[in-house]
Regions:
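N-terminal core-binding DNA-recognition domain of tyrosine site-specific recombinases/integrases
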Residues: 1-66, 82, 103-105, 209-216, ...
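A short, basic/aromatic helix-end/turn motif that makes direct DNA contacts
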Residues: 126-132, 257-263, 273
């Protein structure tokens, strides 16, 4: 059972592409996978067994020199012991936006874009100008920047069809992106006598390569400290905040899953169960007021 599940879900990955987030998502998918006898889903004990098997395989790969470390180490947390995901409330979101506006336009644009669309930090770094459809106000998410241990950042395509998706922009976000492009064009003209090409990354280094996601993580922590904002937040918290705000507005789970690029709606429901529970309570209260019960 374990080898088949491992091969079906992770068999297309190179060893060096097995990052912690990929492995954690695999465990979460297995929690929703049906048993062979049709009697419900896999038990937590089965998921733990998959983890132990994968750990053994990757430890052998380290011993043979194929990997420098075991990415599955400390990846497994039994269900029910998940750490609460930090999410900014509406008041904190307002403070974050104000703080972003005190940064250079590059950082303001990046952080507002992640908050507005729920992109992963690497997906935002992988965006090119050609991915934006200004008329339809959409962005085609079709690649991401990944930082591997002891290696330079690389750009990779999504591993699943759900990761390759469209996200939608408000008029205000479009205006900010256009302003950022104008600044990029001015900067390129001044420093290199060049123009911005459609194939250029939105957030690029001087050598033309996409910026490292870790650069934005470091800057985000500085912003939190400088503005007395909760230090448990991270760039990824902006993605969680986006999802939580969508749910609070009554957006259904399948739509949220599609926007976030989750392969299964059940993954979204599991991650944001608390937010959906709040919506259920609100719905029940509305019904109670309507019928007087």
């Amino acid at each position: 059972m374990a080898p088949r599940n491992l091969c079906n879900s992770l068999g297309n990955y190179k060893l060096t592409d097995l990052r912690k987030e990929v492995i954690r998502e695999f465990y979460e998918e297995m929690r929703h996978a049906p048993r062979l006898d049709g009697r419900g889903n896999l038990s937590e004990k089965s998921v733990e067994g998959l983890h132990n098997t994968l750990c053994g395989i990757l430890s052998a790969a380290v011993d043979e020199g194929y990997l420098t470390h075991n990415p599955a180490w400390r990846c497994y947390k039994p269900k029910g012991q998940k750490k609460e995901r930090p999410v900014a409330d509406e008041e904190t979101v307002k403070k974050l936006i104000t703080a972003f506006e005190g940064q250079s336009m590059k950082y303001e644009t990046y952080f507002k874009l992640v908050l507005a669309t729920g992109l992963r930090r690497g997906e935002a770094c992988g965006l090119k100008w050609s991915d934006i459809n200004w008329r339809k106000r959409t962005i085609h998410v079709q690649r991401g920047v990944v930082k591997l241990s002891h290696q330079e950042s690389i750009t990779k395509d999504p591993k699943t069809s759900s990761g390759d998706r469209m996200v939608y922009l408000s008029k205000e976000m479009c205006q900010l992106l256009k302003a950022w492009r104008k600044e990029c064009e001015w900067d390129r003209a001044q420093t290199a006598n060049e123009t911005v090409d459609e194939d250029d990354y939105l957030f690029r280094q001087s050598n033309g390569k996409p910026m490292n996601p870790c650069t934005f993580t470091y800057r985000f922590k500085l912003i939190l400290k400088a503005n007395n904002l909760p230090l448990d937040l991270s760039v990824h918290s902006l993605r969680h905040t986006n999802a939580s705000l969508l749910i609070a507005q009554g957006v259904d789970v399948r739509t949220v899953a599609s926007l976030l690029g989750h392969a299964q709606a059940s993954t979204t429901l599991d991650i944001y169960a608390h937010a959906f529970d709040k919506n259920k309570r609100k719905a029940q209260e509305k019904l109670g007021k309507a019928i007087g019960l």
